[in-house]
Each structure stands twice: as structure tokens, then as C-alpha cells.
């Protein structure tokens, strides 16, 4: 789910990027904010940082004594992406294993669908392994699958989420390729 957020942030601008007219200063603040925002990746509370939408307020700059850099407190609006337990999502399979499949959903790389949560699907080994049911519905690499999220885990060191998914429910499963 995408969330609209308003966040405070501190932006450091080197002295050489300061401009008396102010126009270049606002640009320098925006560039530094975008770089810092992109490098942060995600937080447990807000999910993955996706985009800065508006720079709402630039506070008064404070000069750092030893470096000469100027610290500007800013307020901006942005978009984040976070999944929740019980949410229905679409994932694209990128790895098929005997015990389940790994999918991607937006910036989330590890959504795991266990074979125990795929009723009626059987593993078929081979060069390109798949899961198939009696109706010949297939789950294989590059298949888009509609699933329900049954668990979420925040990985602090990697700064990313992992999720567990299930096909147990109405209207869940591989989406047709029509």
C-alpha cells in the first residue's frame, strides 16, 4: 500500500554550494534531500521510501563551526510503500524451489509463498520447475500471483521487509496471461 507522509529532515549543504540569490540554495537543498532520501531505503514504521513529492518548508540554516557546512531543517511530503498483514498483493515469481516460491512486490524482494499455503498445487521438478494444480494452472518464474499477506518481518541490518503469503482465500492465485 502506498502512504502519503510528511517528514522532517536535516539537510547539510557545503559552504561552496551557497548562493546569495537563493535560487541555487533551494536547488542544492533539494538535491541533498533527494540523495539522503534515496540512501535511507526504508524504515520499520513507514516502509520503503519511494518519492519526494513536495518541499514544504525550509527552516533557518545553522552554520557548523568546524566544517563550515550549513544545516537546514526541512519539512517535505513524500510517498512510501509498506505492506500489511491481511493485505491482498500481486507478486511476480522470481525463484521456484521445492518448498515454495519467492516473489517481488514493488520494492519488496522477498515475499515467500510456501507449498503448504498453496492448496491443490504440486511441485513439478525440471530445468524450469513449476507448481501446477489439476486445472493446469501454473506458478513459475515470471508468473504474477495474487496472494494474501499472512506475516511480515522487518530486517534491521538490511533495512528491508520480508513477507509470508498464502493462496488460501477467494480469488487468489496466478493471474491469467490474456
From Swiss-Prot:
Predominant location category: nucleus
GO biological process, any: DNA-templated transcription initiation
UniProt KW Cell cycle keyword: no
Pfam families (alphabetical): SHS2_Rpb7-N
GO cellular component: RNA polymerase V complex
Location within or outside the cell: Nucleus
Keywords: DNA-directed RNA polymerase, Nucleus, Transcription
Record-stated family: Belongs to the eukaryotic RPB7/RPC8 RNA polymerase subunit family.
Assembly information from the UniProt record: Component of the RNA polymerase V complex.
PANTHER family cross-referenced by the UniProt entry: DNA-DIRECTED RNA POLYMERASE II, III (PTHR12709), DNA-DIRECTED RNA POLYMERASE V SUBUNIT 7 (PTHR12709:SF3)
Function of the molecule: DNA-dependent RNA polymerase catalyzes the transcription of DNA into RNA using the four ribonucleoside triphosphates as substrates. Component of RNA polymerase V involved in RNA-directed DNA methylation-dependent (RdDM) silencing of endogenous repeated sequences, including transposable elements.
Identification of the protein by name: DNA-directed RNA polymerase V subunit 7
Gene that this sequence comes from: NRPE7
